Amino acid sequence: HYKFFIIEDRKFSDIGNTFKNQYLNGPFKIKDNSDMITAHGIAGEGIVKTFSEINTNKNKGLLMVYEMSSKNNLISSNYKNNIMKYVVNYNKDIVGLITQKRDLGPDSILFMTPGVNIKNNNDSNDQKYRTPEDAIIRDNCDIIIVGRGIYNNSEPQKTVEIYKFLAWKAYKNKTLSM
């Protein structure tokens, strides 16, 4: 058996019933083939409530989009306040936040951050990047999410090892300075 989690990074963002049909009945069998899923709170509490009702054994996790790494995104402080309310009210289901930095929130959830790249600061698609060190030490996130920094590289396997090394080094430096 493998020792990793499968995250369906679909960023669900619809009403509860539509989400339920996609999660339970879609062709990709998301409920059976993933350990965690990502979702936006833009449609309100319905998606979180529905996930909680479906997740009866509490063996699946919900990662809520809290902030985005794209320039000029429309996430507001009101949106973020509501996400934090969901984190408190659905603490057995929401296991983490997709965010740019650790904000106020319980220590029991993971702060996962996209937009990590060691070669670029931004791209032509309005993506803002930062280094693993900045994401982990300065922004106090737990887990980095690297996409294009790996799959746009000619040696992706070697590149994964570099990111792994840099992230672990940053994590150790952060914990030593606490």
Language-model features, listed with the residues they occupy:
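Chitinase-like catalytic core of GlcNAc-active glycosidases
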Residues: 1-4
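Conserved anion-binding
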Residues: 6, 10-112, 118-121
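Conserved, mostly hydrophobic/aromatic
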Residues: 9, 37, 135, 147, ...
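Catalytic cores of alpha/beta
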Residues: 17, 21-26, 120-140, 158-163
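Conserved active-site and cofactor/substrate-binding residues in soluble primary-metabolism enzymes
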Residues: 46, 82, 127-130, 154, ...
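A short pocket-lining beta-strand/turn micro-motif at the edge of beta-sheets
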Residues: 109, 140-146
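Glycine-rich beta-strand-to-loop/alpha-helix junction loops that act as flexible
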Residues: 114, 146-149
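C-terminal helical cap(s) of enzyme catalytic domains, especially alpha/beta-barrels
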Residues: 134-138, 150-178
